[in-house]
Amino acid sequence: EQEVTALVLDAVAKIRAKSNTPILLVEHAGYSNAPTNAAQYELYTRLNRGQRVAFDKLMNEGTPNLFYLTHDQLGFSPDSWVDYVHPSDLGAQKQADAVTAKLKEILNR
């Protein structure tokens, strides 16, 4: 979790050093077997927590043009996967729709 936080903080700092372009951080979509596999659930939720800690820290510091898309906003369902991790066509469409909606929100602000 702390490693993810550090990596996100570093990545945003490197981008901000050169550009004020909007940055959209997107949470891990999870795994299809996470509801029945505690290890898989813990893995992706830990990664997402680490990223969220970095986002919150950056927002508290006043980092401009930083945005966030949550796991829940991605809206994956059981049919969104072809296996444990790779999205099906439906999953890819859900991800594209969620990212598109967020990008429209960012660009129209």
Residue ranges and their predicted role:
Residues 1-109:
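Alpha-helical cap/lid subdomain in secreted, periplasmic
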